[in-house]
Amino acid sequence: ETWSYNMVPPIVPGFSFNQVRSSSRVGLHPQLVDYNLLKSDGAHVGLNDDSTVAPGASITYLWYAGDIVPNKKGTRIVGIPHEFGAIALEDMGDVIKHASHGAIGALVIEPQCSRWDEGAGSKAQVEITYWKPEAVLSRHGKHLKRKICPAAEPNLDSGKLYRFKEMVLLYQDNLSVQQYGQPVPNLRNGDDSEDSGQKGFNYRTEPLWARLGASAADEPETMSQFDWSNVLSSTVPHFRCEADFVNKKYCDPETPIFTAKAGEPVRFRVVHPGGHPRQHGFTLFGHDWVPSPWVDASKTMGWNQDGLTRVGSAGGIGPGRDVNILTTAGGDCKVSGDYLYRTQEGFMFGGGLWGIFRVDENPGLRWYQPAWAWAGNLFGYETNGVASADVCKVQALNNAPVVQP
């Protein structure tokens, strides 16, 4: 046990985070998937069997990525597969302290007939290639053991393969972190216990106060004395980081730096497995997406033709919540460069909840601007009847890339 500044609401008088001993039992509790509640819930609730596990022991959970329902005659169960995307995995062995010490996770349900290639040095970024299952009459609702994918993978040039880049990002907002052997104090701007603890993404954090050489507990008056103008830049020196642009030594944040080529389809999986009930807003600069990317009666993900709204920020992200963002690297105009992703709460952003989405140039794409597209068009002025989507166009100089539908 280590002492922490992390706090919880005062459930009983004198109750605090540091007065609770961590449980030695752990479990994996999923959402959305179907399973036997008595054996694979990953929790110990009421009169149900305990499906958590003690130190030195193991347990196997069986989950189905979809709905399990009886057939019309009630003679057997049938499975209806669902592409859920990202799902939070919670440790229900100790809902108070385990997430604070890193016991979190996510389950990603990919499209049917998928394979994935992990990026170098990170399992949070992969390239997904998938092809649609064989067109079998009444495929949905068949027996669970029925084979649904083709026997062989289609050729790359067959037009039947689809590909996207996937980035998984886990919120952590109740971390018990130490510096120089001492617990890091809470951010001075926090409002109550829901804001306590340190912040991070994927076991990484990059507090702005640390980049400035300040302390988490410094008063706002003290913080206002620092020069914030280049605090997000990777090309200028920061506290304990000497950037050298000529020799390509950069002061990048410790939080995940996701990469993709301009024009490449990408899916951000943003998950908050467990922590404080303070909700977050996630923003990806320079990009937008449809809030509900569901098609095929909400069984798969894709371009939702009925989704008329496009947003650049997703709110209401609390414990157990997930957001699936389907967009294009570099935005509609497929522009390369570094794009900021961050949480929208100001002091939590300063506490480390931000990072970089690095979009590299794509030699297979060429951007051009039509002659009519002057600056006024970009700000909603008269477009002479030309659709705003034509402000930028991209032409392929080589074979068209494999994309998602």
Regions found by a protein language model. Name each.
Residues 1-405:
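Copper-binding active sites and cupredoxin-like electron-transfer domains
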